[in-house]
């Protein structure tokens, strides 16, 4: 069951290791090895998931609508696995091609952002029902807001990012309200 979360766990561990090692003034090659190792572990576990077919992860009773509980279900099936495999392959391709550009100025913070987006992108791929998709997509929107507000962009774009996030949250809440109205009818 928790095998489904292993690629996400490997990527989150890679993010933490990159953040810690980058503070120690390590060489770029060391940081690249950490990044590539995390990408390889993610790729390997997603490949293994195809053959192991772990059970879905269900968070029962996540929200109550009247007397009806709404469950969140995450996992891989024959269709979603393909998208997760494609995402892991893109990450691995980016990691391997970074080796060519190591002599250029590298910013490990950008690698952390890439890994964070892959983690946040795997959750919507794993969603097996509408409410799971809404929750996962909201998490992805939150990651995007954090990156825009963290100082990588000018203040004008920060305001635009906050407004876009507010509109997305409004859309998510409208979808949740419509879904809850459907359950009560």
Predicted regions and their residues:
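Generic alpha-helical transmembrane segments of integral inner-membrane proteins
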Residues: 9-16, 89, 119, 123, ...
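Transmembrane helix-loop-helix hairpins at membrane boundaries of multipass inner-membrane proteins
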Residues: 1-6, 14-112
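Single, functionally critical "micro-switch" positions that shape active/binding sites
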Residues: 10, 76, 128
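Alpha-helical multi-pass transmembrane bundles of energy-transducing inner-membrane proteins
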Residues: 24-26, 112-116, 120-181, 185
């Amino acid at each position: 069951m928790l095998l489904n979360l292993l690629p996400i766990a490997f990527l989150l561990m890679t993010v933490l290791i990159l953040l810690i090692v980058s503070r120690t003034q390590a060489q770029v090659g060391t940081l690249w090895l950490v990044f590539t190792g995390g990408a390889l572990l993610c790729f390997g576990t997603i490949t293994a998931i195809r053959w192991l077919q772990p059970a879905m992860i269900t968070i029962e009773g996540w929200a109550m609508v009247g007397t009806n509980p709404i469950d969140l279900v995450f996992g891989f099936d024959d269709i979603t696995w393909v998208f997760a495999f494609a995402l892991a392959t893109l990450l691995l391709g980016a990691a391997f091609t970074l080796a060519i550009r190591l002599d250029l100025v590298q910013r490990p913070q950008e690698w952390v952002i890439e890994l964070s987006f892959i983690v946040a992108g795997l959750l919507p791929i794993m969603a097996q029902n509408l409410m799971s998709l809404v929750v996962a997509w909201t998490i992805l929107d939150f990651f995007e807001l954090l990156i825009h507000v963290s100082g990588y962009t000018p203040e004008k774009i920060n305001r635009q990012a906050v407004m876009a996030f507010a509109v997305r949250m409004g859309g998510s809440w409208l979808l949740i309200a419509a879904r809850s109205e459907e359950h009560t009818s």
